[in-house]
């Protein structure tokens, strides 16, 4: 990609360098971020491969024409998949299991969704055939891991790895993964009965997502239900209950509904496509998300209301996520505003951080974050495709 805009072209080249350095050429794993601080006071201990981050990163690699690296990653993912079809939280680059505190069901859905996305770009049927055993096991697990009362995926941690519950974003990822699996089965000429069963499950899940997460009185989606709240501080919810969890009378915070505004709710539309960007349910949700999560002065968007991780700064990937959504909504001016905010948030070495300090406006915490660079490439690719990349 060459745009003729120096800042953009330089950041694109830096992103290619980051992708190369964060890819294990022997195993195919994709590193979330390097560890640069032995005392862990300025970094987040991110030197692992997460299926979630990697699915977004692989999508960006495809935009860069790096198909071999993408296929190497998905081959790695197939090798580390559990026998029951699930994927654990995170791994070392050699495929060994890293320290974990719970299943994050969106990762499995994201990996299967990403496999189909790669095929849609490359049309590599051999790749699809190699992935079929992994896809079949993965989708079968996703269709089993169900809360029969809600119809949603059973309890798992959210994409921020903080709260155990049933989440809108995670449910959307699972739905997209199941639908992708059904399409892969059809493309390979596998059992039409199996593909049909999966599509029926995805259709029921779509209904459950709307039934559980749409709040007509608020005219927007909520992020989670049946949530065990994290123990790091007071949570902001109107429906909090205390539950005794053992005979020693230890109790924990739970909430029946978590209406906290969270940028991940955009995932219902981008990238997972359950709702069109101009669907009224999405536009009303997105409008309040962007309004309430914007950080005054510094700009950019926070992850969610009341976020207190590293002080609650705006994140690069969240702001670029909103850019992707606005491109689909054809609000290119807003998308460019978010895009250029991220471009101007690089370090002196041209690297994108995880966050921008809300007080100083300087790059903060993990540097570089591979997911941030991936989102930059994804937004750049879509703006160029739309012919809407203008010099700011």
Model-derived segments and spans:
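Acidic/polar, glycine-enriched structural segments that form the non-catalytic walls/loops
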Residues: 1-45, 125-126, 391
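Extended ligand-binding clefts on enzyme/binding-domain cores
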Residues: 7, 11, 167-172, 196-317
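Long, well-ordered core segments of solenoidal/helical folds
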Residues: 16-26, 65-88, 131-152, 199-219, ...
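Acidic/His metal-coordination segments adjacent to aromatic residues that form catalytic metal sites
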Residues: 36-43, 87-103, 148-166, 243-250, ...
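Alpha-helix capping and helix-loop boundary segments enriched in small/acidic/polar residues
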Residues: 45-48, 98-106, 122, 126-133, ...
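C-terminal capping/lid segments that line or modulate ligand- or cofactor-binding pockets
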Residues: 46, 57, 99-121, 233-247, ...
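Aromatic-rich carbohydrate-recognition surfaces in CAZymes
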Residues: 46-148, 171-178, 372-383
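Inter-helical turn/loop segments and adjacent helix faces that build the functional surface
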Residues: 118-129, 153, 180-200, 275
